[in-house]
UniProtKB/Swiss-Prot annotation:
Residues 152-167, 432-443 have a biased composition (Basic and acidic residues). It comes from Arabidopsis thaliana. Residues 440-516 form a coiled coil. GO terms for cellular component: chloroplast. Involved in starch granule initiation in leaf chloroplasts. Residues 1-47 form a transit peptide. This is Protein PTST homolog 3, chloroplastic. Residues 359-375 have a biased composition (Acidic residues). Gene3D superfamilies: Immunoglobulins. Keywords: Chloroplast, Coiled coil, Plastid, Transit peptide. Contains a C-terminal (513-598) carbohydrate-binding domain (CBM). Interacts with PTST2. Its main location: plastid. The gene is PTST. GO terms for biological process: regulation of starch biosynthetic process; starch biosynthetic process.
Amino acid sequence: MATISQIPFSISFPCFEFRKPSFYYHQPQLFVSYLNSTKKHSFICFACSTKQTRVRKRVKSNEELRSEIMQFVALAGLPEGHVPSMKELSAHGRVDLANIVRRRGYKFIKELVANSGMEEDCNELVADSEDNNTNIETGGSRACLEDSSTDLSKEAEKQGSLSKDESSLAGVLSLENSFSNLGDSNHSGEITEKIFKIESVELNEIADIENSSSEASVFANHSQDLYDTSSCPDIEAGNVSMTEDEEVNDVDKDFSLTFDHYTSPTSNHYTSPDLNSIKHVDIATGSSYDLTSENTMTNVENFQNQQIDDIAANRSGSADDSLVESEDNDWMSGLSSCTSSIEEKTTRFIQNGYLDTVGADENDIPNESCPEESSETTKGGEYIGDSLGGPRIMSTPLNGSALALKEIIHATEVNSSDRNSDQRDGSVGLDTDPHHETRKRENQVEIDRLRFMLDQKELELSRLKEQIEKEKLSLSVLQRQAETEIQKAQMLISEKEVELQEAEESLSGLQEVVIEYCGDGNAVEVTGSFNGWQHRVGMELQASKSIGKQKCWSTLLWLYPGTYEIKFIVDGQWITDPQKDSVTRGHISNNILKVDSQ
């Protein structure tokens, strides 16, 4: 029966730590307490109301500020790259942006907008490179998974699927265990079961190909280090005297690779090379070899051939140069021991039924004096000779991997010829090495000088660019000023044209009037109510009409139709012409001028 235990607890309010005055001085609105004396523990709950704290607005980051400014420039129709001023922002209703520009500074906003273009270009380049890398990795993993799943697709529906996180690693471990247990008839049922699991795993990987790129890379790493993983408990129980790590080192150091199988009702033999001696792994079995599935054998052979090709490629790329420096006297001194070793191995093959390999360090060479031993030794293997005349014996697996061994021979011969040619080229190039070093140093100095010149030119170009930008800015300011002045002049011209038109309309009713004065005097002027008695109009002397002391003066005026009062000024005295009509008001008398409309 489940019991419920009462655990004491307390509720703390973090906000009260920073607002102790309000906790002390504000009376709580609600106080609830529940005390039960009969129970061991009690529960107390406090509820208190405090003043709402002031929430400070979040400060906008540079990216947000830049995006808002770019949006404002686009919406306002301003040119791209233009930095809006506080006046422009306020005019368009963005007072918040105007305050931010005022606080952070116009120079900072300008640099922020200017750097946006460069960051966009860098982001595009980075995005393109990431897309290319993703496509390459996805394509490689997809091709690897498709190749490995074509041969295993027929039996995949019979088995359950593993989880996605463990599918690739489980497939690798199952494939390693089935490969290491290939010659064990006692574990044949386990190999078949593991192969079926691999088939279901491969189908799951194909179905989830987009989520398995990392798992495919794990598969590639484990396939290169196949023998580095720990073997299954069944193999450990079989008294395996050699670890997989030693097998990898032996294959990398030795020139030959041996996979020798011999099937018998009682035992299976697996032979692998070692740097110092040949080691045998005898696994006792209690059942016959019952791998009857053709697909299983085909998959194992394909995997075995692939591993042989990989090891041959690694071996051909990292061949030991010490074989080139071997001497004939060492080779001749080991002939006798090699012959006895071949005899012992031949006898062992006849008695026990399995064939040992001849290691590279023993330098076993078929002798003309022992043709029978040579033929018996090479009966179950391939004869391989290197560029130095040192033949090797490589056992051929009984499951049909002779083609892979031929590829190993071809790769080894090509590597030996390339190594010899490289050595000859190196011996020839020793004499010219100082010359090449001198040329290399001179080229490096020239490259450094060119780089320095390039940097100087780039600096000059950047300065010229800045100067051009400044000139463009000043020219744009002058252009705006000129446009403003032109607009003002155009407005003034339009106003004057209106005034001129009005003046023409007002002058359309003027009449031409000729005023004459005859009398004695030297200078005569006329004034009157037509100009407000303010301006005096000089009169010209008419010599044709003057007779003796009687002189005549005349002038031409443009006046509107009506009656005007005029007066003549003769030698500075205001007088009236007695020959014209006059009017008297009080003590003042003036001549009358009448203008009739036509």
